[in-house]
């Protein structure tokens, strides 16, 4: 028995940004990597562990960061992500379930 594939609503980058802000994961049909997706990381903080981190930490030893986009890579690692011009102009974005 074949599994039914759910139809994905295709979006432009502006719509993808709105989905990201709404805590959704998004990806592009044009990406070759299986399982890759982008998600929004809200502002927060982490404990400083490096000398540079300690030099900018607050009195509680925390480094504060601004919101950013992250990408889950094919090898299951995560990196910060900045869209290319091709990503910005693409109209093949979809929400990942």
Predicted regions and their residues:
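Catalytic phosphate/metal-binding cores of nucleic-acid and nucleotide-processing enzymes, i.e., regions
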Residues: 2-53, 57-59, 74
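A short, compositionally biased
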Residues: 21-22, 63-67
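Short, surface-exposed linear patches
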Residues: 48-49, 61, 91-94
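Short, compact, well-ordered microdomains
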Residues: 65-97
